[in-house]
């Protein structure tokens, strides 16, 4: 299932993949929740748009990843914008 975000960063089911794609293309600043470089390490938290939940009623729509350094390829996914922000902070402190 594909999603967009409302003005409060709450997920809204998209009516089609085209609606979700259009939203993503026109909301790049909201798709990238937080992105930071620390030396050669890049930490990125983004809205995925596609539900990554397995056997869950709650969609998993955000993801934090670390690229580079000792935690390269670290990944966490979240069910809310607020959890994604907290997860990004956690990744910064690894």
Label the model's feature ranges.
Residues 1-41:
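Negatively charged, low-complexity tracts enriched in Asp/Glu with abundant Ser/Thr
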Residues 2, 72-75, 85:
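Replace the tail clause
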Residues 7, 69, 82:
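Short, ordered coil/turn segments that flank beta-strands lining enzyme active or ligand-binding pockets
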Residues 78-94:
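A short, charged, amphipathic alpha-helix used as a generic interaction element across diverse proteins
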């Amino acid at each position: 299932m594909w999603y967009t975000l409302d003005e409060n960063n709450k997920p809204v089911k998209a009516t089609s993949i085209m609606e979700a794609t259009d939203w993503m293309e026109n909301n790049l600043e909201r798709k990238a929740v937080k992105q930071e470089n620390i030396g050669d390490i890049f930490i990125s938290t983004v809205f995925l748009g596609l539900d990554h939940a397995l056997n869950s009623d709650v969609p998993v729509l955000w993801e934090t990843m670390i690229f580079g350094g000792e935690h390269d390829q670290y990944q966490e996914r979240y069910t809310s914008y607020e959890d994604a922000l907290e997860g990004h902070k956690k990744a910064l402190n690894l």
